[in-house]
A protein has these predicted regions:
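Phosphate-binding loop of NTP-binding sites
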Residues: 12, 23-24, 105-235, 239, ...
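Active-site beta-alpha connecting loops in nucleotide-dependent enzymes
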Residues: 62, 328, 346, 350-422
Length: 471
């Protein structure tokens, strides 16, 4: 692939790519169109495509973009990229048409081409949990001084990361992205595309074991971020994580550590829980405060503080930004309703983040009943029963007044909790969401604190919405 010239402020105006650029980036085969043809942007969704954009036909789990090529052309697409020749309609000679073996790989190649046009730092964040909060917190801190570009929500996969990079514009000074994975090789590919200068790993835990097999597999996958940083890249790792702490012996590139009560460059001590958050001492010199009662958010804050210092922010500005940061939606977001308190952690779940959330619920200072509404943890493979049963035992020993489980896997949790001595009347299992809503509607009392958590596929946000509407 021919490397494009570095142009810091070179992407201006309406037209972004020429057909020649696309062919250089992807190595695709030109079927029609003039090399000087220019495109206003890249689209993978015919519903939102704008005139003069290039349409990539991507096959997803529930759709195939090749089925929408005709619609994209009707809406004014100036060209198409496809991988299934039998589904590609004939186009006019002036419409660009490019064949590639894999359109997802082509999207990544175009995104890398675009990223190389900008001489700006890219900060990449991965980990088994805490990616999104750390990304949002780091971007929030850095935006006090810089124009920061970031993923929207959790666009952290082989489609979302390229789309994020493709929306970098000349006004941006920094890009902060999270990298997700549930299969071997994805972090390696994402780093090839994003070419990060600073890599942050929040932790290593039992997540996506269905495809990564075990925690060692998770470690091998996540550590690809450190191995593939653009030279002389800097790695920033959580020393409170046992697996990551071992990397202090690796000298292939600069590695800095953050942690809680650890011997490291960015250290939090003197943790003090308050009704509205946590205060802590940064490097025994600066008192910091966060508006969250979850201890792991101190670790997330330490990563954001380190980013601020790396990029020249003064400690006073960093302190103010950290103090005013608000949690992303659906991630331990405390919602105070008239009758009860809802802790919305409904976006996703794995053993590590579930334990953190349960511990937060147990520390909550409000005096009402503590209710855990738990949905299945997905992608745990042959460890699924073991982990769900483990949490039944764990919960039975915690000051939790009521356990409500939902889904086929979490039934192992309710059964384990009962066998471990939790009162039968304090355990309710529901097969589906409608039964959960029916139970909560009849049984939630004034002053109760509800933690709602489950994997993305469980759509636990439906329960959060119900509680808001009920209030």
């Amino acid at each position: 692939m021919a490397a494009p010239a570095k142009v810091r402020f070179g992407i201006t105006g309406f037209l972004m790519f020429s057909l020649k650029d696309i062919l250089e980036a992807t190595g695709g085969t030109l079927q029609s169109g003039a090399p000087k043809t220019r495109f206003a942007g890249i689209s993978i969704d015919s519903r939102t495509l704008k005139p003069k954009e290039l349409f990539l036909a991507i096959r997803g789990q529930n759709f195939d973009g090749h089925d929408f090529i005709a619609q994209a052309l009707k809406q004014g697409a100036a060209g198409i990229i496809y991988s299934e020749a039998e589904k590609a309609p004939k186009v006019k000679k002036d419409v660009a048409s490019v064949y590639v073996p894999n359109t997802v790989m082509a999207l990544g190649a175009i995104a890398r081409y675009h990223r190389e046009r900008f001489d700006i730092p890219v900060i990449a964040i991965t980990g088994s949990s805490g990616k999104t909060t750390t990304k949002e917190m780091a971007a929030w801190v850095l935006s006090a001084k810089y124009k920061v570009h970031k993923n929207q929500g959790t666009q952290n996969n082989l489609i979302g990361v390229p789309l994020t990079l493709l929306s970098i514009q000349s006004q941006h000074d920094l890009c902060v992205i999270e990298l997700g994975t549930n299969r071997k090789g994805e972090i390696h590919r994402l780093t090839q595309i994003a070419q990060p200068n600073l890599g942050i790993i929040t932790n290593i835990g039992p997540a996506h074991l269905e495809f990564l097999e075990n925690v060692k597999g998770v470690y091998k996958e996540k550590i690809e971020l450190v191995r593939n940083l653009v030279s002389p890249g800097i790695a920033l790792l959580n020393k409170s994580d046992i697996a990551l702490a071992r990397l202090s012996r690796v000298k292939t590139r600069p590695i800095f550590f953050y942690g809680i009560n650890r011997d490291c460059e960015f250290n939090a001590t003197e943790i003090n829980y308050k009704p509205d958050g946590i205060s802590f001492s940064f490097n025994n010199a600066h008192v910091m405060e966060i508006r969250h009662c979850a201890l792991h958010n101190v670790s997330n804050a330490m990563a954001a503080i380190a980013c601020g210092l790396f990029f020249g922010l003064d400690i006073g500005t960093i302190r103010e930004r950290i103090r005013n940061f608000d949690s992303p939606e659906m991630r331990l977001k405390e919602i105070r309703l008239n009758r009860c308190v809802v802790i919305d952690d409904s976006y996703n779940s794995n053993p590590q983040s579930l334990k953190q959330a349960i511990d937060l619920l147990c520390r909550h200072g409000q005096g009402g009943r503590k209710i855990l509404i738990m949905g299945d943890m997905m992608e745990l493979g042959n460890k699924s029963q073991e982990f769900h049963a483990y949490f039944g035992n764990y919960i039975s020993k915690k000051p939790i007044d009521l356990l409500v489980t939902m889904g086929s896997f979490s039934k192992w949790t309710s059964e384990s909790a009962r066998k471990s001595g939790m009162r039968t009347e304090a355990i309710v299992h529901c097969d589906d969401c409608s039964k959960v809503l029916e139970f909560l509607g009849a049984n939630v009392k004034e002053g109760d604190i509800l933690l709602i958590k489950g994997s993305r596929a469980m759509k636990m946000e439906r329960i959060v919405s119900f509680m808001k509407e009920r209030d």
